[in-house]
């Protein structure tokens, strides 16, 4: 009989690579600031709100660059009014009326 070889070493290696990639993505995301607690001083609250504002600005910022180009091109093709740029002709040229 022929022994069937199981690909478990390959599956384990793929799982480890996937976990490493996911770990790198998690580290790239900014960490949410820790709340100071109920008995915090006004200076600590001020620092917390400043860091929270900075965190929210990072998370919700608009991203410019290559992602914007296809959408802008698509909207330009769909929503431009080309009738202003076309010359006005009441009759087709070269066609004799009878």
From Swiss-Prot:
UniProt site positions, description: Cleavage: 30-31
GO biological process: eating behavior; feeding behavior; negative regulation of response to food; neuropeptide signaling pathway
Cellular localization per UniProt: Secreted
CDD domains referenced in this protein's UniProt entry, alphabetically: PAH
PTM note: The peptide YY form is cleaved at Pro-30 by the prolyl endopeptidase FAP (seprase) activity (in vitro) to generate peptide YY(3-36).
GO molecular function, one term: neuropeptide hormone activity
Signal peptide: 1-28
InterPro entries named in the record: Pancreatic_hormone-like (IPR001955), Pancreatic_hormone-like_CS (IPR020392)
GO cellular component: extracellular space
Modification Tyrosine amide occurs at: 64
Keyword Signal annotated: yes
Phosphoserine: modified positions: 41
Family the entry assigns: Belongs to the NPY family.
Listed PANTHER family: NEUROPEPTIDE Y/PANCREATIC HORMONE/PEPTIDE YY, PEPTIDE YY-RELATED
Purpose: This gut peptide inhibits exocrine pancreatic secretion, has a vasoconstrictory action and inhibitis jejunal and colonic mobility.
Protein name (Swiss-Prot/TrEMBL): Peptide YY
């Amino acid at each position: 009989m022929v022994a069937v070889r199981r690909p478990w070493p390959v599956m384990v290696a793929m799982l480890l690579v996937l976990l490493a990639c996911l770990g790198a993505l998690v580290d790239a995301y900014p960490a949410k600031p820790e709340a100071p607690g109920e008995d915090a001083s006004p200076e600590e609250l001020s620092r917390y709100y400043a860091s929270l504002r900075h965190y929210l600005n990072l998370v919700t910022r608009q991203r410019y660059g290559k992602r914007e180009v296809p959408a802008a091109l698509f909207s330009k093709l769909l929503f431009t009014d080309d009738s202003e740029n076309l010359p006005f002709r009441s009759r087709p040229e070269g066609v004799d009326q009878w």
